[in-house]
């Protein structure tokens, strides 16, 4: 996904450590918490390694919650995420989810229900 040198990493965030006890799935709340931790480092222009080691699968909701919060709430660009975040322990499924989520969250304008109704009526 990116070619960052591992020596440039300032902080390592293990997704596995955020897993709720006794739950197998990662949810949107955990995605938001991880996003806030990543954002702390990105605001300082620090490189972050997000490790998916020991995580066999995550839901698309988890990935979009994490990346959506970084892009929308914290205001980072997709380019900044690509430049400062280094992912490890990815399998093909998680990597595809990250790519789809970044594309979905960064390229589509957010449509409110009022705007949606207006578009349907036209």
Mark where each language-model region is:
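Serine/threonine-rich low-complexity intrinsically disordered regions
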Residues: 5-8, 77, 112
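Short beta-strand/loop segment at the start of cytosolic alpha/beta domains
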Residues: 1-17
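Aromatic-anchored, charged helix-turn/loop surface patch used as a conserved interaction hotspot
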Residues: 106-110, 114
């Amino acid at each position: 996904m990116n070619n960052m040198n591992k020596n440039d990493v300032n902080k390592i965030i293990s997704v596995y450590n955020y897993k709720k006890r006794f739950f197998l799935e990662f949810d949107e709340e955990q995605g938001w918490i991880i996003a806030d931790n990543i954002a702390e480092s990105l605001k300082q222009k620090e490189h972050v390694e997000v490790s998916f080691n020991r995580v066999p699968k995550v839901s698309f909701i988890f990935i979009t919650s994490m990346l959506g919060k970084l892009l929308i709430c914290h205001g980072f660009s997709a380019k900044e995420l690509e430049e400062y975040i280094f992912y490890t322990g990815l399998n093909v499924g998680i990597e595809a989810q990250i790519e789809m989520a970044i594309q979905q969250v960064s390229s589509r304008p957010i449509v409110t229900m009022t705007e949606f109704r207006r578009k349907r009526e036209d």
